Design a protein with these regions (language model features):
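Cofactor-binding beta-sheet edge motifs in enzyme active sites
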Residues: 1-505
Length: 505
């Protein structure tokens, strides 16, 4: 087969303000690659998305490859949260598969002089009766690009042969053998090692002292230590670079540093009162019916208050990243769950267009929401820019647990009632102090201001899934008290069930 035929492919893409977003490429040899901007956090989406694409293309699962979270090739589909990969992010991939199959079927019908309805796909070969042709025959050495048609007709689930059937997780064999490459295993030619020195305001990301607390450090005291390459400072960001990771940590621990101490956090011993007293802005999500009237019509009522404390991820492995400044075209190896958002943050950090930064996503130790995976990418990139080499940074366990955005504390006041044994009225007010955990390097360097920010969170599952005539659902948006971001919503599964299970008065 000639070189032209070998490079032939059918591409399904979408135009966006930021450029073309490719969802699928079908190749001459009967294989296909799907592109999805989400990442696998241990849920097996690589296999699941492969099944979806193989189903629509009528290809064997082994002939389908899925590329996840690589900013150079995958579309920006937002963060990998909840179950949105299959519910939302898989939709254009499924449509692209259906569209590609329809295109190839139409080409085969012309080539074989056959009714398009009688065209069959088997193992990457297109057949009509005793006649057949390959994808290479249909592509004829051409690269074809089609705009995604969101009206493409996908398969009826009753015709599924792959989706819904058992399939071995592609990632598990190597993981079970200890051969799977995690972010901690990345080793780049010329790589050196960094270690960061955090300020004394651990776990805080708002206040006038953020980025303004470093008084001095004594580089002369450590310059002669084994492996020393550099000390790097930007505002309150302070790190060292050395030839080996153990040398970097030893130098960081020996470096004399003087800080201004932050003001204490008041009121954490009584978290309920502290949350209630914080400045907040109420945001009504559902005020259908008339709750005041409805609760008065109830035969049975309940009023409960629930306090959810701060939680940490407690990941089995501290966050790690490798960054290569690469002469102003950075490449970052990361365990992030938000590769495209991370790319934007890093662009702000080093004053580059986001599109000029490449994020290569590797699986990490995992978390239940936002942890330090993005922070450590900023650390590594600042150090790499300073020394001109790829730099690996891995936090210590203490740094990880002290600085990770905690699952936000939450106060929930719930009232509800039954009328004739049916849900009739339900109200919940919740206070949720979070700002989504801005990238720490942006704050420490002063690239973004540290004033308290509110974020419209705390509402993900707050509206009950039941029919309730009278509702009053309110989130009180508030700035964080300590560094906090998302960690698994509990509204629906905890407050609603707790209210239902409460003893009668």
């Amino acid at each position: 087969m000639n070189d032209v035929a070998i490079h032939a492919a059918l591409t399904i893409y979408e135009e966006r303000p930021s450029g073309s977003a490719v969802y699928l490429r079908v190749f001459y040899d009967g294989t296909a690659t799907g592109y999805n901007g989400h990442v696998d956090l241990g849920t097996g989406i690589e296999t699941a998305l492969g099944q979806i694409l193989a189903e629509e293309l009528d290809l064997p699962l082994a002939s389908v490859r899925i590329e996840l979270g690589h900013t150079l090739s995958t579309p920006d589909q937002g963060p990998t949260i909840a179950s949105e990969t299959i519910q939302i992010a898989a939709i254009p991939l499924r449509l692209a598969g259906a569209q590609a199959r329809a295109y190839l079927a139409a080409q085969a019908a012309l080539r074989l002089n056959a009714p398009i309805a009688d065209i069959e796909f088997r193992e990457g070969v297109v057949r009509w009766g005793d006649h057949s042709c390959t994808f290479a025959d249909l592509l004829q050495g051409q690269s074809v690009a089609l705009l995604l048609d969101r009206s493409s007709i996908v398969k009826n689930p009753s015709d599924y042969r792959i989706v819904g059937q058992k399939a071995g997780r592609r990632d598990l064999p190597d993981k079970l053998r200890g051969a799977h490459p995690y972010i901690h295993d990345v080793d780049v030619i010329g790589m050196v090692h960094g270690h960061v020195i955090r300020p004394p305001y651990a776990g805080r990301d708002s206040g006038a002292f953020i980025g303004q607390s470093l008084i001095s450090y004594g580089e002369d005291a450590v310059r002669a230590m084994a492996g020393f390459i550099a000390v790097v400072r930007h505002g309150d960001f302070l790190g060292v670079v050395a030839e080996r990771t153990d040398q970097a940590q030893a130098i960081a621990e020996a470096l004399p540093v003087q800080w201004h101490l932050p003001p204490p956090i008041e009121g954490m011993e009584n978290l309920r009162d502290t949350l209630k007293a914080q400045p907040s802005t109420p945001r009504a999500l559902d005020s259908s019916g008339n709750f005041a009237r409805g609760i008065g019509e109830c035969d049975v009522t309940r009023t409960r208050t629930y306090l959810w404390p701060y939680h940490e991820h407690g990941s089995i492995g501290p966050s790690c990243a490798v960054a290569d400044w690469n002469d102003g075209n950075p490449v970052v190896w990361s365990g992030t769950q938000n590769p495209h958002m991370l790319r934007g943050d890093l662009g702000v950090l080093v004053d580059l267009p986001a599109e000029q930064i490449e994020i290569r996503r590797y699986q990490a130790a995992g978390c239940y929401g936002r942890n330090c995976a993005d922070d450590v990418c900023g650390d590594a990139l600042l150090l790499s820019r300073a020394v001109g080499h790829p730099v690996r940074v891995q936090l210590t366990r203490a740094q990880e647990h002290l600085w990770e955005p905690k699952g936000a504390a939450q106060l929930m006041e719930v009232q509800g009632g039954l009328k004739s044994r049916n849900l009739h009225a339900y109200a919940i007010d919740t206070w949720y102090p979070s700002n989504r955990g801005p990238n720490l390097a942006l704050l420490l360097t002063g690239r973004i201001s540290p004033e308290p920010r509110t974020s419209d969170m705390g509402d993900r599952t707050i509206i009950p899934p039941y029919r309730v005539p009278h509702k009053h659902i309110v989130v009180h948006d508030m700035a964080p008290i300590v560094r906090a971001a998302w960690m698994r919503g509990w509204h629906r599964f905890w407050t609603a069930k707790s209210r239902a299970a409460a003893p009668r008065r």
